[in-house]
Amino acid sequence: MRHGDISSSNDTVGVAVVNYKMPRLHSKAEVLDNARNIAEMIKGMKKGLPGMDLVVFPEYSTMGIMYDPDEMMATAATIPGDETAIFSAACREANTWGVFSLTGEQHEEHPAKAPYNTLVLINNEGEIVQKYRKCIPWCPIEGWYPGDTTYVTEGPKGMKISLIICDDGNYPEIWRDCAMKGAELIVRCQGYMYPAKEQQVMMAKSMAWANNCYVAVANASGFDGVYSYFGHSALIGFDGRTLGECGEEDMGIQYAQLSVSQIRDARANDQSQNHLFKLLHRGYTGMHASGDGDKGIADCPFDFYRTWVMDAQKAQENVEAMTRSTIGVAECPVGELPVDGKERTAGE
């Protein structure tokens, strides 16, 4: 894995991430104009970064945040649709893959139900090869309908890619799910705002380290009249070290070459920090020395995960017992979220 050049090779995937300035849009026509701007940016970037195999744009970069619910429903896209057609044409012309945000994608029961928050991975032939719907929307603010699974797709030069979105990345479970499905590069597109800059930079690095995987983060920048976005789009090696990171600048770009052979060699031959292998071969050294086989223990030792899988309602009740029983909070109401029932306070 290398940083500082504009090239790539048969063994390296050239990945660019963009601090796209958060747009403030109100209509389908404005969304399509912005999509065309993104398309032109891709073509320009390819001239400057001839090794670029994959370009990643942040969450909300296509549509912005539609703070008006009627505008959000009116601009919700179909996939494929007008927006993806623009992106597909740009990927073909620039001979590159791209990750793009659709906020939102029409629900199957549109307009009766809220849209999804969706990413698409488009290959260099203009084909949509992965569509991911955000599993963990940023409640209580985001009103997206949640998705229900992650995916892994063979990307440029065979690198295996998963997509996640913003608040998804605050939950170690989703990173592990992607990695255990075989993802070598986890792409996190986010529209993350202050104050949580330090926490988000730290989370991406920690999850790369914990999952022996590359991480590409594309985050919004600028101010949209409501939130201030901190940028810091970054590329992180599978050892948790940052290869390149933007600052807060609008339209900042970082680029690095991610080696396919190096991550596969590390996953096969690293030992003390091979977290994926060791999690499913717990204590293999001591068990081997004890004459109890050479595979360690594969069984899950974590009671919470057992309960969640076997009895999700019980797991929900358990977490409510230590947090709260309503989705709203009486001391700081958000919208019309219900706050019936007694809320916990410090010391109770």
Swiss-Prot record:
Protein name, entry field: Aliphatic amidase
Family: Belongs to the carbon-nitrogen hydrolase superfamily. Aliphatic amidase family.
Family matches, as InterPro entries: Aliph_Amidase/BUP, Aliphatic_amidase, C-N_Hydrolase, C-N_Hydrolase_sf
Pfam family, one: CN_hydrolase
Residue numbers annotated as active site: 59 (proton acceptor), 134 (proton donor), 166 (nucleophile)
Role noted for this protein: Catalyzes the hydrolysis of short-chain aliphatic amides to their corresponding organic acids with release of ammonia.
Source species of the chain: Alcanivorax borkumensis (strain ATCC 700651 / DSM 11573 / NCIMB 13689 / SK2)
Entry's EC annotation: 3.5.1.4
Reaction equation(s) it catalyzes: a monocarboxylic acid amide + H2O = a monocarboxylate + NH4(+)
Domain CN hydrolase: from-to ranges: 13-260
Annotated GO MF terms: amidase activity
NCBIfam families: PRK13286.1
Signal peptide: none
Record keywords, A-Z: Hydrolase
